[in-house]
């Protein structure tokens, strides 16, 4: 059994307190993606952060203890990064040399290009976000977005509506690795879907000019049902994928947002599996806490980063929920603050 021990909790300031958008609404940070590049945490909010000098993607240093230092906050403002909307996950390529970022791909306007910003897979060299490129772009000049990739996702998922919330690159049998997309929702429409924990993917290679190309067909690879596990109390959807190169395994993060007798419940669970078990379509193991019970996050766990062979960083996207619970002695967070947890993993 894999056990998680909580090392620390905290919050990160992701923009100035009291920041408002063009409609004079208070901006709320909703961190949905995080990756550790070996030097810094790279994070993203799935809602825009206004200001020409800002974007929804930003980075900050962490201490040797794994604590983020929000005084080192730096926004990534290169054109494609600033334009893409509703980021859901980050990953490093299997060789650790490039950063990948995906949006949710949960909406498109077939009559116009108005919603193309929600359909992006981006890649840039480690530490060089200004060299960002769009993966699988539309071949028409001036049309933004990974629209060729969207067509491949349509075929692999096989549903009119879906939402991508996971991204990971693992070693593969072809090319430079196997790129995995985690599906959280699928169905007929945004108001007619089921929560799922499903993975589709394809092998890829990195081109000479630093872009990513798929070398085989995007296809369904894996699926499991958290509800079949004892101790899982809520219906979950996949919220993040993370490859652990130190232990050659895959983490799967799931989260829930349900209403029971008029009371809203949010939270999440963490799962782990060896890569050979993933390839064999075996069930993942539910991570337990120090008491041996299933680890259940009290916040909506959406972002996951491997820091080293033993430590994980979990970021929460609580939407408009402002309560901090065990994260802090304060009752509520500021809208500019994102809560997080640092875990130590043992087997």
In which residue ranges do the predicted regions lie?
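Sequence/structural signature of beta-propeller domains
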Residues: 1-347
């Amino acid at each position: 059994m894999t056990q998680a021990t909580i090392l620390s909790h905290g919050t990160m300031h992701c923009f100035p307190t009291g920041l408002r958008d063009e409609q004079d609404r208070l901006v709320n940070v909703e961190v949905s993606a995080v990756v550790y590049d070996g030097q810094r945490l790279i994070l993203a909010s799935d809602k825009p952060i206004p200001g020409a000098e800002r974007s929804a993607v930003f980075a900050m240093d962490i201490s040797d203890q794994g604590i983020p230092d929000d005084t080192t906050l730096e926004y990534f403002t290169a054109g494609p990064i600033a334009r893409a909307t509703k980021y859901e996950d980050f990953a490093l390529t299997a060789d650790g040399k490039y950063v990948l970022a995906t949006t949710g791909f949960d909406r498109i306007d077939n009559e116009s290009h108005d919603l193309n910003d929600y359909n992006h897979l981006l890649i840039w060299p480690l530490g060089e976000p200004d060299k960002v490129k769009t993966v699988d772009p539309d071949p028409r000049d001036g049309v933004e977005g990974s629209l060729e990739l969207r067509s491949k996702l349509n075929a692999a998922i096989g549903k009119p509506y879906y939402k991508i919330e996971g991204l990971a690159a693992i070693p593969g049998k072809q090319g430079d690795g196997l790129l995995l997309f985690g599906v959280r929702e699928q169905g007929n429409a945004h108001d007619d879907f089921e929560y799922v924990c499903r993975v589709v993917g394809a092998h890829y290679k990195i081109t000479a000019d630093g872009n990513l190309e798929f070398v085989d067909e995007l296809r369904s690879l894996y699926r499991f049902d958290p509800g079949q596990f004892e101790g899982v109390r809520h219906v979950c959807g996949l919220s993040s994928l993370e490859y652990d190169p130190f232990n050659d395994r895959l983490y799967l993060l799931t989260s829930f947002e349900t209403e029971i007798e008029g009371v809203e419940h949010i939270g999440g669970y963490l799962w782990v599996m060896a890569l050979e078990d993933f390839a064999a379509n075996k069930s993942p193991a539910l991570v337990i806490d120090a008491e041996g019970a299933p680890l259940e996050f009290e916040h909506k766990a959406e972002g996951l980063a491997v820091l080293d062979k033993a430590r994980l960083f979990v970021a929460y996207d609580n939407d408009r929920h402002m309560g901090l619970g065990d994260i802090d002695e304060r009752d509520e967070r500021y809208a500019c603050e994102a809560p997080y947890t640092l875990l130590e993993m043992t087997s």
